[in-house]
């Protein structure tokens, strides 16, 4: 029995996050940037099959808005689930003060 697959949509700001991260890494290590991009894409595919895989944030403000996040290396993919669609809101380095960016 196959699971129902969810659609994954990156919001514009998440697309910008992704592009900035990959460009930053590529400036010094192009092969590492390519590997990172592939890892993000694979994790998004995984989310499409298991949307509740990510954790609920400990920050009450984000949890109350039904955000979840998935850790990929040092980065956090923040997303929400609405019906059969996963909306990726941000892709941020875990050391950032990410709460101020929502």
Model-predicted regions and their roles:
Residues 32-37, 41-43, 47-50, 61, ...:
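Amphipathic, hydrophobic secondary-structure cores in small proteins
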Residues 30, 45, 49-53, 75, ...:
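Generic structural signal for secondary-structure transition and capping sites
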Residues 54-83:
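Basic/aromatic recognition patch in beta-strand/loop cores that engages polyanionic ligands
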Residues 1-39:
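Arg/Lys-rich, positively charged N-terminal/basic patches that mediate binding to nucleic acids
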Residues 22, 41-44, 89-92:
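Conserved protein kinase catalytic domain
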Residues 72-102:
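Enriched for short, Lys/Arg-rich terminal
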